[in-house]
């Protein structure tokens, strides 16, 4: 049996990234959580952006946990802010790092599963431009395994 080489692709915080892109925001630097805020704060968040995770928020928290953690972070920011006063807020990581007087804020985006499925299908079409469908193994809406064995072997000759 010959060895096979696989490539694993897992799109970074997929639902949160889609929501950021829809808003013209950078998914790596924007504080965003995907959750149905019309339900109680006990609702489970579908996704948390990488920037918001950097404050110690896990990937699938309940919404009240996000609210609580951001309050804790802002309490600490206020203690360190000039005059111990927060003068505004931002959802942007760069602005928050540059200005200690800003409170951490975040966007709550309602889930849009049908839209995420459409975006996932568009991404799959990109894979198909370069990889045969039989070599793409879909694991989930944002993860695939690609059998790259035959593509790599042609590089050796």
Residue ranges and their predicted role:
Residues 1-156:
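Gly/Gly-Pro- and Ser/Thr-rich, intrinsically disordered tail segments characteristic of DNA damage-repair
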